[in-house]
Design a protein with these regions (language model features):
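Conserved catalytic core of nucleotide polymerization and phosphodiester-bond processing enzymes
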Residues: 1, 7-243
């Protein structure tokens, strides 16, 4: 989560809508811009462009295709450190591959050995990019490719890039945080029956634990990410539903 959001300092989508340079009030003045900010945040956070916005439902939500490039540019101008991190991460991956020397960028690192490029996560877990190569992409830039399972579920050469590497790291770190939270919950004798994205579904007697107690377990920091703002919310009911 955004650190300021986790500390209760505002609405992340409304803050992202500040890129439109006008006041934004949910269900109020310029409230429609909050939705544009939400779409931009979800679609552009990992380097997405017009195609990403469209796949997130931008056109169905009333945005026009010719205004999408302006939204993308505004989001990137409002988030220069994120954009810089995309390119710094790609550079670190490329350098590790070319030189064989470990490259650290923020809390992650890249190493290249045994014919594999490794992304080293803060938890110590590693993501593998098998048989990497540098090849020109459709835009004429050199990009990193590797062997893996594509969207057609077949083994083939895959292309990655700055934003996608950051997405890999972000989702993998989030997974590691959730996995440790699930271990803590299980250690307290609670029965996890499923998990959906960042949610845990628990089947338990009504008087075993309160929602607040379970949220506290979910919000504990693993030893490898002390200081990272974590927050959890939950509900109890007779069946699962989206809160």
């Amino acid at each position: 989560r955004d650190p300021e959001m986790s500390r209760g300092l505002g609405d992340v989508y409304k803050r992202q809508s500040q890129m439109f340079h006008v006041p934004v009030v949910k269900h109020g003045v310029n409230g429609e811009l909050r939705q544009k900010g939400k779409i931009a945040t979800l679609a552009c956070g990992y380097g997405g462009s017009s195609g990403a916005l469209i796949s997130m439902g931008a056109l169905q939500m009333g945005l026009k295709e010719d205004e999408l490039p302006e939204i993308i540019d505004s989001w990137r101008e409002a988030n220069p450190q994120i954009v810089k991190y995309w390119w710094d991460t790609e550079k670190a991956a490329m350098t590790a591959f070319k030189t064989g020397e470990r490259q650290e960028i923020g809390k992650i690192a890249f190493e290249f050995y045994s014919g594999t490029l490794w992304m080293v996560l803060p938890s110590g877990r590693r993501l593998a990019y098998l048989k990497p190569r540098q090849q020109p992409n459709r835009f004429g830039r050199m990009s990193l490719t590797y062997e893996g399972v594509g969207q057609n579920h077949k083994w083939s050469r895959q292309e990655t890039y700055s934003g996608r590497l950051v997405e890999n790291a972000t989702q993998a770190i989030a997974r590691d945080i959730l996995a440790e939270a699930m271990d803590r919950i299980s250690a307290h004798g609670l029965n996890i029956v499923a998990h959906v994205h960042d949610e845990v579904i628990i089947e338990a007697p009504k008087d075993q634990y309160t929602v607040e107690e379970i949220c506290k377990l979910m919000s504990e920091n693993p030893a490898w990410c002390k200081g990272l703002p974590l927050a959890a919310a939950g509900y109890k009911g007779n069946y699962y539903f989206k809160d």
